[in-house]
């Protein structure tokens, strides 16, 4: 099938799956709720009248209980941002123009000389702690220098333990989060979705080890997922997803019409689509890997470059009840599947479960998001809003 034929096949399936919602050409019909049609506060990198110089200060000044849109001008804003009020919308000048950046990694001491470290879940550059938060047209980057540490050989005295460094965390208090034309940059654990529903449209996410992970329900559309290289040769240089979806939750990470790409230096056949994360959890009878975290990742009509492993999925270690280590297997301890994958990394074999035509209607946008219609911002509306 030629490129044109494949494109028509993809568009036809998109129309079927999304009920005619032509997101590829500019978004669904106007969704319910207040549109993003005014700027309530501005953040600029230089001192200016009627503008904040800190994103956090603009959020802190927002009133409670109503949508509040904050425009962030061009520049690199070096700060951690905690969004703890419902209805906050951050609108940048473009993902190549507005960057929120900060460096923090899991093994970093919380203070000089302290034995306490931040741990993975306190490293996020931007942390969403409230529902109905939207991010448009900006970049979030955890600037911890993972590659420098990765170059050090095992056993080197300067090698760091705890290199996880999150760019964006969707916390358990969040729900109905929107990311549109957003770039997330990191290495290990770039995007952490702890809970709630998140819609990611026309965005970019870059990393290598488990760089999309967690128990949240995330729907990705027309988004580039980019694997980054490692310093030394290894069988698997990373894993795209590490879901910990609870068994009672029907949807985990769902990718519709996305692209799995790679930076220069990522070898062929080196990146599985995912592995099952069973986080260590405290129970009445001890602390061990959560047996109910049967992670779910689904790829539909996704382009896969040659770096995607032919085996498709991989196993992951966890803590057994007796404290020993055990392996969780992709075909028995997770819910992994795909449909309509294409490109050099698309393979058909018994290790890569396929969604049947009968089950395909279960993966519409409306079903995956439980009938929530996200409010999006077209490129034209963005230009008019920020001019």
Which stretches of residues belong to each language-model region?
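Hydrophobic helical h-region of N-terminal Sec-dependent signal peptides
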Residues: 12-20
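Bacterial N-terminal signal peptides that target proteins for export
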Residues: 2-12
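Residue-level recognition of conserved structural "scaffold" positions that shape functional pockets
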Residues: 11, 26-27, 82
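Intrinsically disordered, low-complexity regions enriched for glutamine and histidine
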Residues: 4, 29-32
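A ubiquitous, low-specificity "background" feature that marks scattered single residues
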Residues: 15, 25, 60-63
């Amino acid at each position: 099938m030629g490129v044109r034929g494949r494109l028509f096949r993809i568009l036809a399936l998109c129309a079927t799956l999304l009920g005619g919602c032509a997101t590829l050409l500019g978004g669904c019909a106007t969704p319910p709720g207040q549109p993003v049609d005014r700027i309530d506060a501005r953040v600029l990198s230089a001192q200016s009248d009627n503008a904040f110089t800190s994103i956090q200060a603009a959020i802190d000044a927002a009133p409670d209980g109503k949508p509040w849109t904050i425009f962030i001008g061009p520049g690199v804003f070096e700060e951690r941002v905690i969004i703890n009020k419902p209805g906050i919308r951050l609108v940048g000048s473009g993902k190549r123009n507005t960057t929120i950046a900060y460096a923090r990694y899991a093994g970093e001491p919380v203070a000089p000389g302290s034995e306490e470290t931040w741990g993975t879940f306190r490293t996020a550059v931007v942390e969403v702690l409230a529902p109905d938060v939207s991010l448009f047209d900006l970049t979030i980057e955890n600037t911890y220098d993972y590659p420098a540490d990765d170059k050090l050989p095992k056993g080197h005295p300067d090698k760091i333990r705890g290199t996880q460094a999150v760019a964006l965390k969707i916390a358990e208090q969040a729900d109905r989060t929107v990311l549109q034309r957003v770039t997330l940059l990191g290495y290990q654990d770039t995007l952490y979705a702890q809970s709630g529903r998140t819609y990611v449209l026309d965005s970019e996410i870059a990393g290598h080890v488990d760089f999309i992970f967690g128990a949240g329900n995330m729907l990705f559309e027309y988004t580039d997922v980019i694997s980054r290289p490692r310093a030394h040769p290894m069988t698997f240089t990373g894993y795209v997803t590490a879901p910990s979806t609870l068994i009672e939750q029907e949807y985990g990470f769902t990718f519709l019409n996305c692209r799995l790409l790679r930076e220069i230096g990522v070898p062929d056949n080196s990146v599985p689509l995912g592995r099952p994360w069973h986080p260590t959890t405290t129970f009445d009878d001890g602390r061990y890997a959560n047996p109910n975290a049967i992670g779910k990742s689904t790829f539909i009509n996704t382009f896969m470059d040659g770096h995607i492993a032919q085996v498709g999925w991989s196993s992951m270690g966890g803590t057994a009840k007796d404290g020993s280590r055990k392996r969780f297997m992709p075909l028995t301890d997770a819910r992994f599947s795909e449909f309509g994958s294409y490109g050099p990394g698309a393979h058909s074999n018994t290790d890569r479960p396929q969604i049947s035509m009968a089950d395909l209607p279960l993966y519409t946008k409306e079903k995956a998001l439980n009938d929530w219609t996200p409010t999006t911002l077209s490129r034209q509306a963005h230009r008019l809003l920020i001019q």
